[in-house]
Swiss-Prot record:
UniProt signal peptide: 1-17
Record keyword Flavoprotein present: yes
Function: Involved in the biosynthesis of pyridine alkaloid natural products, leading mainly to the production of anabasine, anatabine, nicotine and nornicotine, effective deterrents against herbivores with antiparasitic and pesticide properties (neurotoxins); nornicotine serves as the precursor in the synthesis of the carcinogen compound N'-nitrosonornicotine (NNN). Catalyzes a late oxidation step subsequent to the pyridine ring condensation reaction in the biosynthesis of alkaloids.
GO molecular function: FAD binding; oxidoreductase activity
Entry annotated with the keyword Iron-sulfur: no
Record-given protein name: Berberine bridge enzyme-like C-2
Superkingdom, natural source: Eukaryota
Carbohydrate attachment residues: 28, 40, 363, 502
Disulfide-linked positions: 32-94
Amino acid sequence: MFPIIILISFSFTFLFASVTSGAGGVTNLSTCLINHNVHNFSIYPTKNDQSSSNYFNLLDFSLQNLRFAASYMPKPTVIILPNSKEELVSTILCCRQTSYEIRVRCGGHSYEGTSYVSFDGSPFVIVDLMKLDDVSVDLDSETAWAQGGATIGQIYYAISRVSDVHAFSAGSGPTVGSGGHISGGGFGLMSRKFGLAADSVVDALLIDAEGRLLDRKAMGEDVFWAIRGGGGGNWGIIYAWKIRLLKVPKIVTTCMIYRPGSKQYVAQLLQKWQIVTPNLADDFTLGVLMRPIDLRADMNYGNTTPIETFPQFNALYLGPKTEAVSILNEAFPELDAKNDDAKEMTWIESALFFSELDNVFGNSSDDISRLKERYMDAKTFFKGKSDFVKTPFSMDAMMTALVELEKNPKSFLVFDPYGGVMDKISDQAIAFPHRKGNLFAVQYYAFWNEEDDAKSNEYIEWTRGFYNKMAPFVSSSPRGAYINYLDMDLGVNMDDDYLLRNASSRSSSSSVDAVERARAWGEMYFLHNYDRLVKAKTQIDPLNVFRHEQSIPPMLGSTQEHSSE
């Protein structure tokens, strides 16, 4: 159990003076860190600096999207790895004292690199939480405390060490950091049964811009509401989450069913899928991942029709194999599920099975300790976009999607099913609003390995074109988007008088403009919850210390009041 400490006092002389971003600024920051017992950091190397390999090894370790690894991308002045909550508090205060912008990195999976790149021109640091990754499970209360740097895989593994009938509902990527994942909601294979990861958070420890360590009571219900689904990098730094453990059976069933074929054949399957899956029992999740080509060319499916599209139906059923196959065949006979398509295993084995740790779907390893791994060998360049679907796709819509998918062999399309408990949780329970009325969510995803800007632009433009083609068929007014699939195409906080730095110097009118400009994408991510998030941001971080290109802006009126206290 983590101690609940509301305020940590240090002997800081807190001078918010402007500091030159050159060598003097770095010296001031490093001196401040050392004086407050923070020694685990690496400074951007000078030309002849022998420690450059350490800096770049740290930078690259959790840099998951290679689009942001190019030499011309902005680099952090310092990478800091706090080892304790005291060091984390000192880090925040030292960065503020020396006027460095803070980027917080947990697992480094930000789709737009916001945890390790800043584009507003300010000198910035990365506060990397990988050393703060402890998970403490208490079976008596059926809860666990997970530090913000713990990955989803580490949480899963820690739970499995003490119980084979408890679990946590979150995503399939084990190297994803819990700090960011839960902050954005956290959809996963058990969300139809238990809701999002953020729905199971019962308390949290947040370090704010003043260095205060706040639990749920101390931060207040408005801020506690906001940090669950309101997106990472906005409110402060999550030191730890307290999560509720969820009861699961000892045996669950996984299925991966491949039905490659012509676009017409696959479109007909998908049309039935979208009607069936939202109405399945809560215990059953049946998602779809589609690729334009068969990446498993050595497999013989006995299909005599031309293979134009390769759909993979992924299922998790919280029960035995016989029931799973029976349910599928009764509800979705067109899929023609066989006993051989299903496997019984424990819940933790299913987490490994769907983990893609070996860059394949259906991990064959039985070493569940691999879920603790933080490093991804198979890194790529990628771009993703998202949608929500409220009305069943027509045949025209399905064919449009499959035709666009076929244009890029280095891509996939994901349909995540909704319904179940997701229909029953209020759209205002936490900041994540996409609940009742959604049939499924869509992810458009391109990945590539060419270190060529022209090729990168080609793949990115394909993703944008696909997204634009699907506009008539998805949610509208506003068109919904998932904050964990961050998408800078929707807009950024970098227009004229709204630069992310120097929040306290902006006029009241520019603050209003900033809030209204951010509404363009803020309401796509958060719908009617956007205004409440602005209020929470103004309450917890009025000076906009924690920010990025798509962060929630504060209203300035409270900033001025705060500054005059």
